[in-house]
């Protein structure tokens, strides 16, 4: 594999391995940051007193997004040396990144819409009826 993927050049191997290490660190950072945000969203939608199904949906989407996006970087980092490049590794598992990023983005948008609705629209309608 060394001769086939890297044409026998140690420089190319070192470059891919070093970039793979960056991807593994990136997996940790994304999982940690997005995981904390996911927990915050779960607490926030619970605190807003929303219906249980809506709370479950936001929590599930944000949790899946944070787990999946970190997993994408982790897979890319581990697969890159065997595939010969980090680009090939990212391309081979890009669907994981796309699905998880979309689910996290949907959770973010839904959470902000619910917060704005609860703070401004619902509060404004209470003042009008009082």
Residue ranges of predicted features:
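Histidine-/acidic- and/or cysteine-rich, low-complexity loops and terminal segments associated
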Residues: 1-15
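Individual transmembrane alpha-helix segments
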Residues: 12-37
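Juxtamembrane loop-transmembrane helix junctions in multi-pass integral membrane proteins
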Residues: 15-22, 49-57, 85-95
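Hydrophobic alpha-helical segments of membrane proteins, primarily the transmembrane helices
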Residues: 25, 60-63, 98-101
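Hydrophobic alpha-helical transmembrane segments
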Residues: 30-43, 105-109
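Membrane-helix exit/interface motif
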Residues: 37-49, 72-83
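Cytoplasmic juxtamembrane regions at transmembrane-helix boundaries
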Residues: 42-62, 123-130
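Alpha-helical transmembrane segments of multi-pass integral membrane proteins
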Residues: 67-129
């Amino acid at each position: 594999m060394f001769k086939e993927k890297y044409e026998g050049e140690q420089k190319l191997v070192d470059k891919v391995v070093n970039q793979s290490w960056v991807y593994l660190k990136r997996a940790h950072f994304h999982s940690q940051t997005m995981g904390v945000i996911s927990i915050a969203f779960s607490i926030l939608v619970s605190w807003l007193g929303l219906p249980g199904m809506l709370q479950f949906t936001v929590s599930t989407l944000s949790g899946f997004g944070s787990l999946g996006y970190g997993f994408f970087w982790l897979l890319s980092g581990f697969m890159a040396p065997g595939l010969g490049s980090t680009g090939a590794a990212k391309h081979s598992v890009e669907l994981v990144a796309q699905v998880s990023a979309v689910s996290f983005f949907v959770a973010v948008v839904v959470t902000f819409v619910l917060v704005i609705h609860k703070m401004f629209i619902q509060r404004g309608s209470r003042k009008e009826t009082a």
